[in-house]
Amino acid sequence: MIKKYEACFLFKSEELEYKAALEEVKKQLTVFNASDFAENSLGERALEYPIRKQLRGRYEIIEFKMDSENLKELEIQLKLIKNLLRHMILVKINKKVSVKKVKRRNFREFKDNRDIKEKESSEFNSNVDVKVD
């Protein structure tokens, strides 16, 4: 079954290594019959922690269509690319999500309501007459 995927790749930050690894990724995608490529480069960024002794990396997002049976084999081949630090492939779902606006309430409203309820309950309890025989 052909599905639409979105993959995020993290490459080493050096220009030559980045371009070579990106070409290798594209080559592997075409080997596994991926089609309808859409690329988006997010550029070079500092990493939160070192990955394979690298402190910076280049991010690339590629959207493509591919048969789901080839996905496992593609992931195995991607792990063999030396200058590819990390990758993540997700199934892209194009559903429109309806966003319902919620009225934002002030914290004081909650506090005031609680105080009022406590007063009402204490007044209710004090007005009750109990006869004891």
UniProtKB/Swiss-Prot annotation:
GO biological process, one term: translation
Gene3D superfamilies documented for this protein: 3.30.70.60
Gene Ontology annotations for the cellular component aspect, listed alphabetically: ribonucleoprotein complex; ribosome
Keyword annotations: Ribonucleoprotein, Ribosomal protein, RNA-binding, rRNA-binding
Disulfide bonds: none
Signal peptide location: none
MF (Gene Ontology): rRNA binding; structural constituent of ribosome
Family matches, as HAMAP family: Ribosomal_bS6
Protein role: Binds together with bS18 to 16S ribosomal RNA.
Similarity remark: Belongs to the bacterial ribosomal protein bS6 family.
NCBIfam families, A to Z: S6
Listed name of the protein: Small ribosomal subunit protein bS6
